[in-house]
Amino acid sequence: CGICRTDLDVVEGRVKAPTYPVIPGHQIIGRVARIGGKSSDFRDGDRVGVAWINSADGVCRWCRAGMENLCPQFRSTGCDVDGGYAEYAVVPAAFAYSIPDGLTDAEAAPLLCAGAIGWRSLRLTRLTDGERLGLIGFGASAHLVLQLARHRYPSSPIHVFARSPAERAFARDLGATWTGEIGDAPPDQLDAIIDTTPAWKPIVDALPHLAAGGRLVINAIRKSSVDKNELLRLDYASHLWMEREIKSVANVTREDVKQTLAAAIEIGLHPTVEILPLRDANRALARLSNAKGLRGAMVLDIAES
């Protein structure tokens, strides 16, 4: 099961579970152990994935439009229902995904959320090939977005803003055109920016570097309240005028997950992962909170625990 910052949000209470205790984890890879009577999509032993979206009502206007991520009855894995930091999990068959043979379990896990929400964020930028893209932060999601963007928009320069020299070097290794510290000025105005950090300051710092008509997409379920006073620095003329847009990402759809898995196979995308035993889950979440010593995504190996 992949480890995600949203797991930390659930554990620390920024995302409220309806009941506690709850088992976190929503980037699950496993084998089908038992099938309900009405299921015909899978067989016992099939390798499947389970993502953040655990179910939706299927009848509201959002579900009918293929946007079940906005369903008022949206239920999330590892929050509304128990998740993947466990030996077994239960999921509706319609919200499970066949995992392609070209990916290991550990590689496939982060694609289910870090990859899928990154894919959705990239689509929401409405970037066209040749336009300049910025990525703020360079963790599990951003390192996948960079690779997806290079494939989808091969002529687009990609600028990465990251805190540590190691993260910036990692971004350059994966093909970033330019790297700088968070808050640095890029060499050119950016047509789109995807923010993957938990804080507000990087967004406020980045907005003046957004070109006229540019889009900034916030790739996060929640933002920290620690630095929310940074929003008081917003100046309409320098941060928002000239039809700049700020857009949030709300969850993912099933189609986002399917497209991400298909794209990974098409371009040979193999997430950089660190595999840890379940007993290290708390230490892994602490590392995620501090954002120190991370390269790519962390994945818990439940079977070896």
Write out the residue ranges for each language-model feature.
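NAD(P)H dinucleotide-binding glycine-rich loop of Rossmann-like/cofactor-binding domains
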Residues: A56-I136
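Structural detector of well-ordered beta-strand residues that form the stable sheet scaffold
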Residues: I29, G49, Y97, G134, ...
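Mid-domain Rossmann-like dinucleotide-binding core that forms the NAD(H)/NADP(H) cofactor-binding site
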Residues: V48, D101-G183
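Glycine-rich cofactor phosphate-binding loops and adjacent beta1-alpha1 units
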Residues: T125, R152, P165-E245
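C-terminal hydrophobic helical "lid"/dimerization subdomain
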Residues: A162, R254-S305
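Glycine-rich beta-strand-centered segment in the early N-terminal region that forms part
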Residues: C1, E12-R61, P100-G102
